[in-house]
UniProtKB/Swiss-Prot annotation:
Gene Ontology BP term (one): arginine catabolic process to ornithine
Gene3D superfamilies: Arginine deiminase (1.10.3930.10), L-arginine/glycine Amidinotransferase, Chain A (3.75.10.10)
Keywords from the UniProt entry: Arginine metabolism, Cytoplasm, Hydrolase
Source organism per UniProt: Streptococcus uberis (strain ATCC BAA-854 / 0140J)
Entry annotation: catalytic residues: 400 (amidino-cysteine intermediate)
One GO cellular component term: cytoplasm
Name the record gives this protein: Arginine deiminase
């Protein structure tokens, strides 16, 4: 294990001490109906109310004694000098795939003219409309500029940023800086790169177990830390098996303390985009699960022996498998929506299974999932309920919207 790392996350349920969020910003107001699919949204949240809901989420965490960090502030603090700042701007522009030379130059001039680091970061997150740039003559435009003349953005917004779980994942004392499923979201990982390279507190101090330069895809919603010995990973719409193999080899080689990984293979669709949308740990011996995945679920145990991954498909009951790997007598799987197929489908769509555990048996949930919440309370769990009518439009819940930096050991 790495004693000097400022990251310490060896479970899903240990008391949460420090967490990173992103307050939704102007990037949400750059959503428009014609391009929702391109930006991985199904609807457009009302920003003012989404911010109120997110502020209440952050305050609920603070009321539980949790220190709240913000991605946008950490990113701004990472631009520690002019050289780093310029490198960030150039890398941001390069990853936006702007092909028109004149357009690229105009964007660079705009960003370089922003003196305040926080304002710069916020602008890169919000995206840049073509109307914000000086008029460029047809002679100076590249072919892409002319072909996409009706498209309103010179650089797309990043509206998914408030789902901080996905661009990178904290695992033990390390971090997985992910290569994401879509080009739209993959640009988000640039902020993590600069935080873990240059930030005064985190830069160069956290072991990397996966790098964003890889060409296979993995996202944080598919990376769960069940205990100091066992990880769970999802093979899903957003994460492929090749990435998981790379991640696990790095984790085992860097001796972060983990002995086994359970790999969950389940339906590949947007409804079940990540493992944590259908399966989360809420107590020492309790998990939420969406009943629709149970029939087709396949689980593989992965260990590392003689410098090779050893992979075995597990057969039998999931609850028994989890109990054996967690060292508890029995595990209870709490089904989202109970036994009602309509309620289960509705509440899973509204992230009833996507809970954030902030201490053993203490769980942050959306208040709208009344059936699932009543079941959780009947099992003895204490729920911290938050409003999410606007936040949920992005298809993510409390776990999706949070990245733990520090938890107490269990």
């Amino acid at each position: 294990m790495t004693a000097n790392s400022p990251i310490h996350v060896y479970s899903e349920i240990g008391k949460l001490k420090k967490v990173m969020l992103h307050r939704p910003g102007k990037e949400i107001e750059n959503l428009m109906p014609d391009y929702l699919e391109r930006l991985l949204f199904d609807d457009i949240p009302f920003l003012e109310n989404a911010q109120k809901e997110h502020d209440a989420f952050a305050e609920a965490l603070r009321n539980e004694g949790i220190e709240v960090l913000y991605l946008e502030k950490l990113a701004a603090e990472s631009l520690i000098n002019e050289e780093v700042r310029t490198a960030f701007i150039d890398e941001y522009i390069a990853e936006a795939n702007i092909r028109g030379r004149a357009t690229k130059e105009a964007i660079r001039n705009m960003l370089m003219s922003i003196e305040d680091n926080q304002e710069l970061i916020d602008k890169t997150m919000a995206g840049i409309q073509k109307s914000e740039l000086p008029e460029i003559s047809d002679e100076e435009k590249g072919l892409t500029d002319l072909v996409e003349s009706d498209y309103p953005f010179a650089i797309d917004p990043m509206p998914n940023l408030y789902f901080t779980r996905d661009p990178f994942a904290t695992i033990g004392a390390g971090v997985s800086l992910n290569h994401m499923f879509s080009e739209t979201r993959n640009r988000e990982t640039l902020y993590g790169k600069y935080i873990f390279t240059h930030h005064p507190e985190y830069g160069g101090k956290v072991p990397m177990v996966y790098d964003r330069s890889e060409n296979t895809r993995i996202e944080g919603g598919d990376e769960l830390v069940l205990s100091k010995d066992v990880l769970a990973v999802g093979i899903s719409q957003r994460t492929d098996a090749a990435s998981i193999e790379k991640l696990l080899v790095n984790i085992f080689k860097q001796n972060l303390g983990f002995k086994k990984v359970l790999a969950f293979e389940f339906a590949n669709n947007r409804k079940f985009m990540h493992l944590d949308t259908v399966f989360t740990m809420v107590d020492y011996d309790k998990f939420t699960i969406h009943p629709e995945i149970e029939g087709d679920l396949r689980v593989y145990s992965v260990t590392y022996e003689n410098d090779k991954l050893k992979i075995v498909e597990e057969k039998g009951d999931l609850a028994e498998l989890l109990a054996a790997n967690l060292g508890v007598e029995k595990v209870e799987l709490i089904r989202c929506g109970g036994d009602n197929i309509v309620a289960a489908g509705r509440e899973q769509w509204n992230d009833g299974s996507n809970t954030l555990t902030i201490a053993p048996g203490v769980v942050v949930v959306y208040n709208r999932n009344t059936i699932t919440n009543a079941i959780l309370e009947s099992k003895g769990l204490r729920l911290v309920k938050i409003e999410g009518s606007e936040l949920v439009r992005g298809r993510g819940g409390p776990r999706c919207m949070s990245m733990p930096f520090e938890r107490e050991d269990i």
